Every structure is written in structure tokens, then in C-alpha cells.
């Protein structure tokens, strides 16, 4: 046997052993024997670099190469599921499906694992891409990190799998691994992860795949997409995928009646506490893919599936004290410090009290025995007090009057529950929070910078506002702790590249209260430059589509602050884009002038957002709901039956994708 043949043999053997150990939980060899085979493979691969294979089992150990993730557009959007919380809502879902299909159907019941969603693409039996959910339209390419997860096959075995397909699932951190990781972080005085989902998500986004490999992530796969799938049944496809090497939950059940669905839910509402990974509900899916296609989608979720969320678990523990946190907007949030208590698989020591009204309503006293609940199984909150357990009444909890970080007097705006620190220019958490928002992906998208780096730069006195970022030089940061030459250069490069971010995102990045992405786009489209916006009157602002007086007043207040104007001036000097691009109107027409158009369904040639732009480009107006004033509906595949019914009732014209494209030619 040649060394090349031995490499191929070892790869095949190690793939099989990985599957037996991590998926079947039935190892055939000891860990020592596995490691010996792996070392032999690594030695041979080092001798024969020309025989490198990205899907070799040796690639699972990870690499310490630091690279930025690229964004990948999903071939099929990763939509979220509609949530339900009661048997009544489950019954309503079941009845809707029954009415729409008017034929027999089965419901596939699956555990709703609480991790981070992933989409895996396989071509010719090999893993070629792993992408996070992201915003549902596009996500991060984390293929290198996913290859370190032993329960995900790099190369499929068996036969019958399509030439190309996607399989989706959940990346998880088992409870035992989560507890071990937090113990290690506590020993190193590092911040603890709040729950396994955050730990799994954070791990998957690490730039160092060697660390990812050490975190022992797991994965369950739950949905196949693509052409030429083996079966019409979703459940049956999962069974086939299991034969190809995927880890499929053996808890999934196919139900023929609503009562069977409820029996499944009730059983796992109790037994889920004994599972090795976090779950927060049950997913119900119509089993037939043909029936799924017939039912279609809403704008946000499929009509053929829902998520039933378990009721939050409660525990009783003692309130020791109340501390306060300040967010980037200056909102002050009270936090209850508790005796440690086990709740939904994690140790809870702190819980949110939300605002002063909640504290007053609970009539809280230090030393009270309080009921703690995890909303959605994740965020702990106090929901009640056991007043019968009061033997000695401690001090009544009263909301603070001054900022715990900078000492400024707190204010409460009319109609709001929260108290605010208005010292936004000198309050450390607000400063750091604003900078973190500024550098985020949807804003300036500055690679290499994150909350830890922002905190480090702030502590070193290098930055005090967002404009300070543009004065940084490589020499300023290269000698900082955990900062090398390459990292420093990447950060400066990322800051420089952010100068090309369009005006609408710069406006969003400033963090003006109530000015989110959508508002920023509308404002930028109306005012074209930061100067024009700064000079706008209240009347000018409220005439912008969807901008009410509250948002307008917030914008005026922002520009009335000399410190904010100074920051904008320094951003201008740095070269940040404070004007909108000259809009190319050469292709604008009035072919759709005066027409109100509703978009519905899934399209082949353009995305929904692209069609919205085309409608506006040709003089039309996008509207969200059908009425007698609707000119026509641009309908793609899987148009919702309720919209179709309403359109027919009102006599609204249905226009296909091809017909629409001909209209604007």
C-alpha cells in the first residue's frame, strides 16, 4: 500500500469512527487508538501536501489562523417560526392547516433545540459551506469552525443523497460542556456565558477554530432542502439523512391526530429537564413537502409550521440586594442579586427587575423570598414575592435617583417607564455602548473591533467618542495586551474602509434615539446630507413618511447638542460619508405612477426588497396590505391563500412576476 492509499484509508476509517462515536454513541475503538490513527494521518498529510483535502478528518482540529467571516446570501431564506404558547393556539394552527388543505395530513413533532441555527450545503457528498442564520436573508460563512464539530459529517456515507442539497439544524453546547466552560472562565476571571445558546453562538463566531474545536459543540439536523429529495415526507427524509451520517434526533414523532400532538407536548414538557441539551419547546411541521408547498409562507414564517414554547420554569430564592446597569441610551435597569438557584439547567444569581414600576408593584424588600422565572427559558426575571415567608422585613427597595456610573441626576420622560442618565457625553457605559453600536455590522461594520476591544481602548484613554476611532494609528494599539501587529493593522484597515459606508448607515450608526435602520433610510432619502438634516425644522421632519413627532423631536434634540455637532464635524474631517450618493435617475420612469402595489410570495428573478426598489424607481408606491385602493398584487410562488381570497373578494388584479417585468421594460 502506498502512502497516498494509506491516507485515503485512514480518512475513511476516521470518518467512520467519528460517526460511530459522536452520532451513534457506539465507539468501536478507544480514544487512544483514535488519536494514534489521527497522528498517523497528520504525519502522512504533512509529507504529502499535494494530497490535501479540506474535508479530511484532520481538519476538525481547527486552525489558529485569524480570518474575518464573509457574508453569504441564503439560497432559501431562513425564516423564523411563529410562536404559540397554549393548546388553544396549537388547535387554531391545526384547524387552519386542515381547512386550507382539505385532505388528510400528518404533523411531525420535533424538539425545539435552543442553540444557534445553521445551514449546511453538500455537493457530491461533501460539506462545502456552513452559514449561520444571520438576518434570514444572509449569514456568516463559518465553514472552518463547523468542520471542527464532530457530529457534523464532512463526507457522507451510504447512497441516495442528492448531488446538491442543504440541510438545516441547530448547533448546541451540551449542559455538561457549558458548566465546564463557565467554571474555566470563572477561574480565569472572565465573564460567564448566560446560557448554552449564547455559548454556542459565541463559540461559532470565534476567529480561532482551534478554540472552537476545544469547545465540544454538538449539532442536531432537522430539515432538508433542495431538488430531488428522496421522499415527499419530511420525517422520511430525516430518516434517509440519518443513513447518510447526519445526527437526527430520535425523539421526533409523526402524529396523525391533534390529541397525539398534545400527548407529545405534555410528555416532553416534563421530561425535557432530563435531556443533555437545552430545549425551549416543540416544533410542529406538516409532514408532506407537497402540502407544505401548497400552504406556502407569510412574509415572516411558513404557514405549515409553528413553534410551541414551553411555559417558563419558576424557582424560589432570596433577594440579597439590587444593583443598577446603564445602557447606551442612558436607560437605567435594576438588577436583582439573588442566592444562587438552579433554573432551566443553569445557575441563576441575577434577575432583571426592568424598571421602577415593577419594583413598586412587587413591593420588594431586601431579604424577600422571590419567585424567579426564565422568560422564554433564557432571561431570568422576578415575577412574584412569597410574602408569607417574611419573618423580618428588610429595607424596602427604592429606585435610585442618581446614575450609579457618573452620579448624574436621573430623569424620567413623560410616557416612559425607564429612568435615564442624560450625561451621555461623560457616562462610561453610554460612551462605550454608543461606540459598540457605531462599529456594529448593520452600522459602520468595522472588522476587528468588538465590545472587548472597545472597552480596552476606552480604558487606555484612546477613545472617548466615535470620532476618536478615526484618529487611531497602528502604533497606538500594536503594543496593547492581546494585540499583535496583524490584529492592529486589520483594525486600522477596517476603520479606514468604514469611510465608504453610505450616508444612511452612518446616520443609523450615530445612535440617535428612535432612529433605527428603516427610519435612517427614509430620513437619508429625504434630506440627502447631514447638514440638511441638522438644519431641518420640526415641520420638515414630520412630513417625512412614517416620521412622527416623537422621532422628529429626538432628531432635533440630537443636533441641538453642541457635542454631537462636534462629533459630526470630526467625522467629516476624517472622511466619513455625510452625504447621500447622487441618485441615478436615468432609468427612472413613470410607468407605475399613481399605482399602489402589494407584494406577496417568493420570486425567481429578484428578491422582495429588489422589487420594492423597482416599484419606486418606476413611480409606484409599495403598500403592505390589500384594500379597495390597491392597484394590483405582484404575486410570486406560495402567495398566501388569505391574500388571494381577499384580492378576489375586492376584485384586485393579480400580476405574475413575468407580467410585472414586462410592464416595466
Swiss-Prot record:
Positions that bind NAD(+): 31-35, 80-81, 110, 133, 170, 285, 309
BRCT domain location: 587-665
Gene, per the UniProt record: ligA
Gene3D superfamilies (alphabetical): 5' to 3' exonuclease, C-terminal subdomain (1.10.150.20), 6.20.10.30, BRCT domain (3.40.50.10190), DNA ligase/mRNA capping enzyme (3.30.470.30), Helix hairpin bin (1.10.287.610), Nucleic acid-binding proteins (2.40.50.140)
GO molecular function per UniProt: DNA binding; DNA ligase (NAD+) activity; metal ion binding
Pfam family, one: DNA_ligase_aden
Cofactor requirement: Mg(2+); Mn(2+)
Database matches in InterPro entries: BRCT_dom, BRCT_dom_sf, DisA/LigA_HHH, DNA_ligase, DNA_ligase_CS, DNAligase_adenylation, DNAligase_N, Hlx-hairpin-Hlx_DNA-bd_motif
This protein's GO CC annotations: cytosol
Protein name in the entry: DNA ligase
Family: Belongs to the NAD-dependent DNA ligase family. LigA subfamily.
